[in-house]
Structure formats: structure tokens, C-alpha cells
Amino acid sequence: VYYAYGDIVSDAEDGMSQGSAICSGNVVPDLEELMDDDDVKAVVLRVNSPGGSAYASEQIWRAVTRLKAKKPVVVSMGTYAASGGYYISCAANYIYAEPTTLTGSIGIFGMFPDVSGLLTDKLGLKFDQVKTNRYSNFGTTSRPFNEEEMQYLTNMIDRGYKTFTKRVSDGRKIPVE
């Protein structure tokens, strides 16, 4: 049994987790080790997660997919397996949920702070910028995103959502709706 409990993050140091974390940087090599261990005939992945990073979820999903190609993978869902928790589960051969498991929440979102008003109006900070191209300061918190940048972010989120729904559709053998 491999326990995957907590927020899904890329790195234990990334600051997104509010406690225990499922770090793709740890989980992926662990699953590869289980895949290569001839004494392990199947893997039960116990998932208890509200989700987290879409990127980290994709990395773990790929590792589960590689593992599944060599031996059976069974997901056992705990209290919740939502969003990224479901993402990392959907590639398994079998998924079992408790009657009270909260699961699903198939979607992604992005949240980007704009603290420019706080910095300039409240704190009186001014910013001078020197950049090498028009996207060099993309994502700075010292100004709001412009229309082109917002469209780029929207497209990125939409691509991520389409990938997520395709993973679920393929893994569970159901149509995307």
C-alpha cells in the first residue's frame, strides 16, 4: 500500500501545502521503484487529497500510467480524492471509494495576485523596469495582467482542463461530456 495524503505539490519546499503533502518529486521515484520491484505484484494507492498543482498531478498520473503497464494498480480513496486527487487516481485499473468519500471536482483554475495597488498606493513604492522582451515581466505582481496576458493564461487553463478531462475519460472509459 502506497499512501498519498495531502495537497499535491511539485516540491516539498514550494509552500503550497498546509500540512502533509503529496510531492511529485518524491512520489514519482517511489512509484518507479515499486514498478521495478519484482516482489511487488500489485500496488494499492491510498489517496486522500483535495488536489493541488495540476503540473504535479500530471507527473504523478504519468507515473501511475507507467506502473499500470507493468502491474495492477488499485486506488483506495479516503475521505476525499478531489480535483488532483482524482487526477492521480483515474489511471488505475480499479478505483474504490468509501460511501462517504468526496470525489470528483474535475476542473482546474489559476489564481494570480495583483498587489500593485497595495505596493504603489498604500506603500508608495514605484517600479522602474528594464526588460529584454515584451514578456520578460509576465507574472509580476507589480501590475495587473494586460488583455493579451489574460488571454494566454485563459488558454493555458483551458488546455489543462482539456487534458484533465481526457485523462479521466480515457482512464474510466467514459465519454468527455
Give the predicted meaning of each segment.
Residues 1-72, 80-86, 90-171:
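Small-residue-centered hinge/linker elements
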Residues 176:
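Catalytic machinery of carbohydrate-active enzymes
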